[in-house]
Amino acid sequence: MSSTERLQRYLTDERGGCGDEEVAQRLDELEELDAAAGGPALEADVGVLSALANETRYKIIRILHIAGEELCVCEFSPLLDVSDSAISHSLSQLTEAGLVTRRKDGKWRKYQTTMRGDALLVALNGSRR
């Protein structure tokens, strides 16, 4: 059974009858939804969510958010049970996703959350029951 036939069956059940014109109209509406949900915003959002989909990266951004100030990369080592290389790699991924900023201060690199990173954490914190 094609997806169009299935849609027609659904519309018939829901509306008590459905012709080809109603199916075509509904397909147009669904295509508009698909166009609005896709595109560059979808790719960017998936990139951000991918950056958060790792325990080390998520813990780093939570630490930065709670700290409310810049932290040096060396300050994460005592808090995380991963290598310094893994911490640096995680911070780079969070920076590329636009969730943290990096600033060089002499020989040290300091990181802090961006407004977007903070907003995502506030939203996640607010969604817990």
UniProtKB/Swiss-Prot annotation:
Expression induction: By arsenite and antimonite.
Q: Which Gene3D superfamilies match?
A: Winged helix-like DNA-binding domain superfamily/Winged helix DNA-binding domain (1.10.10.10)
What are the BP-aspect GO terms?
response to arsenic-containing substance
The entry's DNA-binding region feature spans 73-96
Q: SMART domains this protein is in?
A: HTH_ARSR
Q: Which gene encodes it?
A: arsR
Signal peptide residues on this chain, from the entry's feature table: none
Q: Which Pfam families match?
A: HTH_5 (PF01022)
Question: What is the protein name given in its UniProt record?
Answer: Putative arsenical resistance operon repressor ArsR
